[in-house]
Every structure is written in C-alpha cells, then in structure tokens.
Amino acid sequence: MFLGVSVRVSLMLAVLFLHRGVALAQSGSLALSDVTAELLAVNPDSHSVSVFDVRSGIRKRAEVSIPGIPQAISIDSVSRKAFVTSRQSNTLEVIALESDSLAGCVAVGASPFGVVSDAKYIYVANQKSDSVSVIHRSSFIPLLTIDVDSDPRGLRLDAQSGLLYVTHFFTGDVSIIDTQRMLVTDRINVNSSANISQSLVLDHDRHRAYLPQTFSNSANQSLLFDTTVFPMVTSLDLLTRTEMRASRLALDVVDQPVGIPLDAVMDSSDRLFVANSASNDVSVIDLATSRGLANLEVGANPRGLAFDPVSNRIFVNNTLSGTLSVIDAETLKVTEEVQNTDIPMAQPLLNGKRIFNDSSRPELAKDNWIACATCHFDGEHDERTWFFADGPRNTPSLLGVADTPPFHWSGDLDELHDVELAVRVTQAGTGLTSGSSNCEPACDQAPANRGRSQDLDDLALYLASLQFEPANTSMSASALQGQRLFSSETTGCAQCHIPPAYTDGLRHDVGTGTGSLERKGTLFDTPSLLGINRTAPYLHDGSAASLEILFSAMNASDLHGVTANLTATEFTDLLAFLNNLAAAPEGGAGVCEKPAALKADANAELVLNQQDFRPGEHLSLSVHSAGSQSADFYVVIALPDGTLAAFASSENALLSGELVPMADNVDLGKGFSVRLVDTVLDSNVPAGVYQLYAVAVSVGEELLSQDAWLAFDQLEFEIRSSD
C-alpha cells in the first residue's frame, strides 16, 4: 500500500511541478506579456492601470481604475489576468484583460508592493506587515502568510529553482523563500549601508543578481553633498549567496552622477538598464565589461522598466509625467514618449511632488545627487541618523508634518517653506528663491519664505499634503489598557504628547544630546507619535533602537514619561498602545469582493519548519488548502520502517493505522489551514527518513482512487539520532 501511494504521489508531483512558473516572475510598475504583447503600466497618482498593445507600435487600449494607490503589477498570460498591489486599500486587485475591467480583489497585509505568480500561487510582499502573502491562484483564496525580516518590498521568482527572492527596502538585504516548502531558507546580507532597495534582476548565465540601491554614508561626520549618498548597483553571487563587493557598479563612476536608482532590467545582449527615479534618466551598462554605454533622459520620476525581446525595446514608466518612454535597445536612443495617463492632480500640487522627487535641476541639487526623496522616499523616513551642522539627526517621517510645527528636531523652522535651507545646504542646490535663504541667524528669526517663489510654494504645498494612511481603530484589550496608562498622571505621557497629533509643539530637555555635538543646544521639539511603530530608531540622534529600549534602559530618569516603576504587564500594555497609533490596517478598507475562481481547482501545501531534526529541536508542521469545491482531506505519513499512518484529526493530530481522512467534506472555497504538530522532539522518536503526503480527494472517494485526486503535496524530512 505504501509503495502504491508513494509512486502515484511522486509521478503526479513530477508532472505538476514541471509546469510551475509559467507567469511573469518579476513585478514593478510595468509588466509586459511576451505571449499577448500587452504592456500594463501602474499610475499611482491617477489610481489606475493603463493597458497598451505593443506588438505593432504602441497603442493605449484602456485605463482601468484601481481603488487605493496602485504600486506594482504582474501578468498571468495563461489566465489573462493581471495582479495589482494597492496601498491604502491593502488589497491585491485583479484585472480581467479580456474585458479590461476589475474582476475583484483579495485582502492582503499592510502596504503591499511586490507581486509575482507561478502556476499555483500568487505572492505579495507586505512592506508594513513584514510578511509575504501566498494566495491560491485559481480560487484567489489566501492560503498562508510567510513572516520575513522588516520592510519586504520587491519580489523576483526564479521559475527554474522555485526560489522567491525578497528585497528589504531599508537594509538592501535579500531573503530567499523556497516556494516548494513555503519557508525562508536563507538571507543574503549586503554588508553595507544600502537603502531604497526595491528591484532585483536575475542573471542566470552568470549566476548573479543585480540590485539598484542607494548607499548611505551616515557615519560620515563631515558630510558634503557628494559624500552623503552613492547610487549603486549591487551584485550578488547566487551560488555562494554572498555579495560580490568587487563587482559593485558605482553609477556615478561607470555612467555619471544619478539620483535614486530604483528599477532595472536586462536585455538580450547582457546589458543592464537602470531607471534613476530622481535624476530622470536611464543608465545603460555592459555587464561583460562593467562599462557605461549610455545615459538616456526620460520623463519625470521613472519607476519602472520592461523589456520586449521581440521588438528589442525598453519601456519606461515616467510616473510623474504620466508618460511612457520607448528606448530602442539596439541604437540606445529614446524613440518616442507616449501619453500614459492624465494625472488628476492640481498643477501646483503636482509640481510640488515633482520637485520633491527631483534631483535633475541645478536649483534642487548639484550634479543630480540628492533629492528630498533620497532621505524621505514617498514622504517617509530612511532609518538613518545623519551628522548635520546642528548635530546628529535621525530622519523623521514627513507624514502629517503640516500638523506638527515647529519643524526640525531643534524646532527652529517655523514654516514648511524653510525647506529652502535643506535644498541649498544638504542638496547643494542653488535654491528655489533668489537672494538669501531667509534662515540667518535662524529660520524662525528671519523673514518668511512663503510667497517668494512659485516652486517653493508648490513644494511646501506638497509637504502639507503628506498624510498618514487611515489608522487602525480596533485595539486589543492590552492596547486599551495602555491607552489609559498613556493618558494617566502616572506616566504623564500625554502632558507632552497631546492627541490628536501627539505633540505639544514645544521644545524640551529630556536628557539626550551630547553637548559637544549639539550646536543648537539640548532642547528638542516634541515629535509626534503617530506611526511610531514603523519609524525606528528613536530620539533625535537615533540612539534608541526600539521602543522597549527607549522606555527602559534609556529612561532610568523618567524623562520620557514615568515608566521606571511600571509592572511588566503595564509596560507591555503601554507598548501595545504606542504600536497601535496610526498602525496601517491589514485588509482592504470596505468590501473586497473575491474574483470568481478561474477553474475547478484545488491545492494542498505542507509546511515544515526545517528538513533535518535532532531530539530536543522544535518541529512544526502545518497544512494549507484552498480550492473551488469541497473535498475529503488526507494527511499521510510514512515512517522510517515503511509503516503508513494517517492523521485522523485536525484538532489533536491523532495518528491512525488506517488511511482515513483527516477532515471530511471540507469546503476548500473558504480555505483550510491546520497546524498538525508543534512540539519539541524527545529522544524516543525513531530516527530515520519520513515522508509526508497531503491529498485532497473528491468527497466520498477513496484515497487510492487516483482519478479522484484534486490536489496533493509531498515532503521528506529526517530525524537524526542524538549521537
């Protein structure tokens, strides 16, 4: 009986896994189907996706409205569906390309970005949930969530190996998920100060990966504009899973100074095209010689690239121009720029957003080097502490900044227009106004900058438009108790951090700051606590790595609220409340209607925490299934001696000597997830190799009736002796 099951499972595995990875394996703001010659472009500020036919020329066919703010897109050419991640709504939106209309959506984690799919699953990177969602491709049922390190952003799926590469936005590191085991199996450490890491390009011939990144030189205490950040393409060795430092491509050397390299794509001639979103150009690099071949000017804020091997063209998504640039990959010339969307934004606000993201104008930056977005990408922070003339300064998020005057940690900016000082000093631009910066001897002691130039007014208008995403209004019992503590006289937190902005707009000496480094003294503006769960490190100098450290080891004198005498439970409750402040909600805002299933289909997925075990180690086994119909569900284990047993219950993992279903008549349309084993192995567990099988069978049919199999999965693991 064991051999019969094993042979049938193995044969079906060989057939099914041969066809995994048929869909687009990389996502970004552009996606191209080689099969149908359809090009899809994400328009974040138009809240839409544009659909083009590009086989003969380039023709806009439709523009599909997307709830929330669309981020990235992937095309499934087999089903003629496109998958779009949407921020704010926190959903995966599904477009039916037969009708160029929305087919439905799936709720995912917070701030989703990257999305890719294979023949069985759709994968979504949830940046502010620190996770990857796995969704059954045919039924659109969320199957499981894989926890990863902080701020996962981009995804790249290698269909050959079944490995999913995950970029981490603030560290530049890459996590590797084995999609057959649904586990993070490795992490490639870039060993640098890499930042703004979104895209990853696979080079199978050289067994390499390339990541456009911005390196931060935040340890330098004598910053100049061109020693602050560096535009870089990092090279990874995929065999050794290490960074190849000697093979880094410094774009300011191999090409010319550029700002914020963000996306990249390879053509058929082993040339790498890099979209530089701040300097509004594309760098072209010969990977064989590591030499720059061209620098091509495109539209405003290019954030996405796609290569068409049939026509040998590169498409560029200029998100703040609302256009597509077309590059001839043979001549390395921009041949045309076509309208993608009409951005429905008032001209002053749109101009302000362009200025914020731009380093190409000499008024804004010297030599294309730094934009406002370099440290405040999408208006947020960079997890860095910089040594400025005033002293060490932790980069704050700008979300909600208009509601929290004065500005700067020293509180010496009394209007948003005083950003003119940063444009001239930090970015080394000539400035958006003529004459003085109106910041001598200090910005709050000089004439106002408002009204001095249209560009500066527009930039301030854009800064004022930056707002937090909708807050998570539901609180746990612990968070509610923490709110009471926060507001009580016991802690005194709310005396300075006054709702709704959670600041009093005043400066205080809270015992931080080294006198020799602080040119403007040790009085610091009270920061807002909104969104504090995503803005580590903390304090003006970034000296507190976490909230736990801030309110314990660094608050012995109770200058950040009276916390020294809190019980462990009270301390946990207070942190729960702080972590809940403006926390991005998971799942779509409002009703999210799941798309209709593509076909009668089902899946089964076994997830084991590792493959080799010894007594005393933790073993965790779970099973997940989804589909469009009901099924009887079996989980069978083959012991090292050949004995076959079945899990007879989904509740207590009882093993039966008979091949009975673990669950009868399960509605897979609702999804099915069970943790079967979660234990520490003791020494009397037999050593040897174990085989696990999960099989979904048509209701009422026998396990060994192969024609009745709807889905299956197989895992092998070994328990070694303690010797």
Regions found by a protein language model. Name each.
Residues 23, 66, 108, 148, ...:
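Conserved loop/turn at the beginning of each blade in beta-propeller domains
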Residues 23-48, 259-262:
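Beta-strand-rich domains and repeat architectures in extracellular enzymes and scaffolds
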Residues 702-723:
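Short beta-strand elements
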Residues 594-619, 716-723:
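Short, compositionally biased P/S/T/A/G/V-rich stretches that sit at domain boundaries
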Residues 154-158, 170, 177-182, 196-232, ...:
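Periplasmic c-type cytochrome electron-transfer domains
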Residues 35-37, 78-80, 119-120, 160-162, ...:
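Short coil/turn segments that connect the beta-strands within blades of beta-propeller domains
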Residues 625-670:
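Contiguous segments within soluble domain cores/interaction surfaces
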